[in-house]
Design a protein with these regions (language model features):
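Conserved, structured core segments of small domains
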Residues: 1-99
Length: 99
């Protein structure tokens, strides 16, 4: 299973339909995080772009899963790139305390 980063381009303006779907979208994302499919999910402060780090068999499988996001039809673009290295504090072992 590969590891991919997905770059999302969000719409310039969020209409009522988009905003109404946010809770359903967040629940969908949270479920994938709990299942270990999504490792990280981030949206830029200006709400124009997003990044999702996720597991998938192929880039096509990852794109297919992104197409199931409740907000998928509003995305202006989706880029899927397979990662060679993904390192973060969250993926490291906890520090040992020698009390």
């Amino acid at each position: 299973m590969g590891l991919y980063v997905v770059t999302l381009r969000l719409p310039d303006a969020f209409d009522e339909e988009f905003v109404a779907l946010i809770p359903r979208h967040r629940a969908f994302i949270n479920n994938l995080i709990e299942e270990g499919v999504i490792l990280s999910y981030a949206i830029s402060a200006d709400r124009s772009r997003g990044w999702v780090t996720m597991h998938g068999a192929t880039a096509e499988d990852v794109r297919g899963l992104v197409e199931q996001f409740p907000l998928a039809r509003f995305l202006q673009s989706v880029e899927v790139d397979e990662l060679f290295v993904f390192d973060s504090a969250a993926t490291r072992l906890p520090k040992i305390s020698l009390n």
